[in-house]
Amino acid sequence: MALNSEVMFREQINAMRSQAGRKRATSLQSFCSGNTDDSSADSTDNMDMMVDYPQQKGVSCMRARFNSESTLSKSFRKKVKKLAQKDRRSKERLNGNSEEDAIEVPRGAPSTYAAPSKLRKSKALDCLVSEKPKDEGRREDSGHGADIEMAKGHFNNVRMKVFAARTAMQVEPALVMKTRKALEMKNAVLENHQSPGAFSLHAAYKIAASAESRVGSITPCNKKVTKEAMANLIRSSYDDTEITQELLFSSKFDTKWKGRYTDIYMRRDENGKKPKRPVNGQGWVMPLKSICEKFGINSTFFTNHRIDLKSARDQVLLMRLLSHDQTSTWISDIHPEAVKNETMAEYLLRELDASTMQKRVQAFKANVLADRDRVRVAGQFYNNIRIGKRMFGAARKAKYLSTIIGGMERRFEILENSVNHIPFTHSASDNNQEKCRNPRVHCKDSTRIALQFPRGQYLGDFIHANRISGKPLFNEFIMTQAPMKNTVDDFWRMVWQEEVPYIVMLTSRKEPERCEYYWPKSPSDPAVTVPGGLRIENFGVYQAPDPLFRVTHLRLIGPDREERHVEHWQGDVNNSSNMYSPLNILRLLRNASKPVVIHDHLGVSRAACLVAAEIAICSLLRGPTYKYPVQRAVQFLRQRRPFSIETPMQYIFVHRLVAFFFRDVIGSAKELDVDYERWLQERSERMFLDDLAAPIPGYRLLSPRADPDIVRMVGRPERPNYRREAPDCVGEMPNKVATVDGILSPAKSVFEF
């Protein structure tokens, strides 16, 4: 009997050893997932596994001591009794007799954060310890024994999670933070008051900032902003809107705002009245309120409510973009006839058929969604298995998708095909190569602007500019390249000759190699003089509601002291995610009765996107009805300005711009948006030679520095200036002809037979 009892006791001890080994050897992954049965940890018979780990201060908390083969020591029994009492206290706390945030420290857990008995949950562990028992803190009857075991199991899981997280934060803190960020991103929800494209607009506004900005000279980007420098900038920003906007919309100042800066803006006005202190006492509130008052935006949503700076400025940017008053009254007060388009007003009042227009727009959406093409998915196959190492094995069947963007790309390929090329003459640009930025982009002779100013003096009549006019447009555009150093005089001669009220520049002012500075930067700069007695002066800078554009008022003085006024709108419209700014500038130009000048670097990319979108919009408003109005608009534009719309990205952007303009009629095209995001993801994997630190990645730009769609054309011969005729007798026996030249195209007529 003694032998049997001894064997039974040893079996119990071995069971305790194996159970302790499994509990101690559980991996971090099982702790985080709540699974304590980890198959990766093998049980062991080593008695050392009974020692708590990790050991605290090098002393074991509990070790089994044997006085004989069959009895345990008295100290061991005391410790077992203490564990039982501790377990009983934990059950009492589980039933609601303790604080919510106080949890028991698991045996062997690190004690560097709190007392050994109790531990307060850290905020860093909220993402790991996120599950709570469904009935926790809500049980009114503590006598329900059925829920105690479930609550006990959940409590043990939480304890083990905390223990694992604490241990991991000591050993691998970077891994824990990375896991937390991944979980936060997975569960993140976009706030309703934020603008999805606000960051891109903010980045574009920073790009469009002044090159000689006073803020930039005081606080370089790579220099740390001190408290004294920040206080000086706040004092200077009270009277300077440009510095105020730089402080509010530059991310390096986000953490520098203090509540005491509000007192700087609490000055008395001319009447001696002191402004009311806002409920939101953060330091950036009063400066942002001054910006809102300047543009007529209601600021109570952040002055009376405590929200963060990022959310407030995103909402202000969106409200500035949605503002209907995008024009200044400077031109309308001086030349009211220049900003009143009688042709458009007459059509909208008397000729517009709203029902027919709505049918055209609905047909446009239906044709865009139905015009799909099969696109091969790169690197994916149905039978992606190679058997053996034979040179000639079974062919792999590629995967294809039927996509809307694929249909647009196919339409662009049809436009680029030499069969649809329209031959034109360009002798004037060939004779003035020094005035052309790119010799391969020719200027069409029949639509080019011939300079005739000044009368009686021949200074040359060539400028790389074309007139875009005729139905369905309501106004006239003049598309040109960015002025060069030797073409600034020709540019202003054209502006004076055509009586242009608006000049739209769609490139950055920080790239002098892509566009010459052809206007006075500030009112204090000297005027620009042009041969023929023309003088251009800066009359002031207007802060437009649209944060992307910088508006300069220019006064032109002619040879007979005649004065004309021009508004110069400059903005780097290169972000394909921004739909508001292009439509705002088109609304401004649509109401002009005189020709307006619009240019980018070569005059065939961003400017072409805006003009093509305007042609398609007017075509849907006025008619006639086309099955593919955007394709027809690009053909219409290329008949007047060849080489317009260079890449599929720009062609797709025109479709999205037109669909966004008619969103109140046709609703949102979710299928197009989803397909476009998928296409952007594939486009991001292509090679773009852009700055990795740029706020807008290269694959989202309309005209990046090195577009893969254009780079592949480098080294190829120039497109032949003739149209290839498609054979009209395909599938029939050819008739006999007298000569070979009657059936061969000019490219093949040089072959010898």
Curated annotation (Swiss-Prot):
Inactive phosphatase which acts redundantly with egg-5 in the oocyte-to-zygote transition. Required for the polarization of cortical actin cytoskeleton rearrangement in the oocyte before and after fertilization. Together with egg-5, required for the cortical localization of kinase mbk-2 and for the inhibition of mbk-2 kinase activity in maturing oocyte until the end of meiosis I. Also required for kinase mbk-2, pseudophosphatase egg-3 and chitin synthase chs-1 localization to cytoplasmic foci after fertilization. The keyword Cytoplasm applies. GO terms for cellular component: cell cortex; nucleus. Belongs to the protein-tyrosine phosphatase family. CDD domains: PTPc. PROSITE patterns: TYR_PHOSPHATASE_2 (PS50056), TYR_PHOSPHATASE_PTP (PS50055). GO terms for biological process: cortical actin cytoskeleton organization; eggshell formation; oocyte maturation; polar body extrusion after meiotic divisions; positive regulation of protein localization to cell cortex; signal transduction. This is Inactive protein-tyrosine phosphatase egg-4. Residues 35-46 have a biased composition (Low complexity). The gene is egg-4. Residues 26-46, 75-145 are annotated as: Disordered. Disruption phenotype: Severe reduction in the number of hatched larvae. Simultaneous RNAi-mediated knockdown of egg-5 results in no viable progeny and causes endomitosis in the uterus, generation of polyspermic embryos and defects in meiosis completion, polar body formation and eggshell chitin layer formation. In addition, posterior formation of F-actin cap at the cortex oocyte and its polarized dispersal after fertilization are impaired. Prevents mbk-2 localization to the unfertilized oocyte cortex without affecting egg-3 cortical localization. It is found in: Cytoplasm, Cell cortex. Residues 408-661 form the Tyrosine-protein phosphatase domain. Changing G603A: Strongly reduced interaction with mbk-2. It holds the Pfam family Y_phosphatase. It comes from Caenorhabditis elegans. It comes from the Eukaryota. Keywords: Cytoplasm, Developmental protein. PANTHER family: PROTEIN TYROSINE PHOSPHATASE-LIKE PROTEIN EGG-3, TYROSINE-PROTEIN PHOSPHATASE-RELATED. Its main location: cytoplasm. The keyword Cytoplasm applies. Part of a complex, consisting of pseudophosphatases egg-3, egg-4, egg-5 and kinase mbk-2; this complex is required for the oocyte-to-zygote transition. Interacts (via tyrosine-protein phosphatase domain) with kinase mbk-2 (via 'Tyr-619' and 'Tyr-621'); mbk-2 tyrosine phosphorylation enhances the interaction. The interaction inhibits mbk-2 kinase activity and is required for mbk-2 oocyte cortex localization. Interacts with egg-3.
